[in-house]
Amino acid sequence: MSVTIRLTIRTAVWRSHVARIANAVDEAGGGLVPVVKGNGYGFGRNWLAAVAADFCDTVAVGTMHELDGLPDQLTAVVLTPTLSPPEAPASGSSGPVLTVGSQAHIDALANWGGRVIVKLVSPMRRFGGDHEMVQLAKRAGLHVVGVSIHPPIAGS
């Protein structure tokens, strides 16, 4: 026996909700970075990225493979570290922002010259390295634009 579930989205209401959140984040001095990875939560990653492009200039994707089909005006942050630099960006594009979380990631991207976020380790010890990785990445010719961290779970 199979069960079919049908989900209907009131698109105008949903987009209005997303716009309110994006505006609230902007007013608070932040910048919204939607995560559009995997299958796009059933909507399709490229469709969600196109919607996100109406509200922001940066999206996060899970892997390098998820860069295909993103709107040209979006900057993509790749959350999963890679051991190979991407191909040269299209004309007028600055290319994706990659994540590095270990010396091996830095070594693999050395002299690539692109932008990176350094993933720092948290008390959870889930991923990342210590704060010295920021300087290691810079010395390897990478342009460090920020750091990321997995916050600890409450009570840890």
Question: Model-flagged regions — what are they?
Answer:
Residues 1-2:
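Gly-rich Lys/Arg/Thr-decorated short loops/hinges at beta-loop-alpha junctions or inter-strand turns
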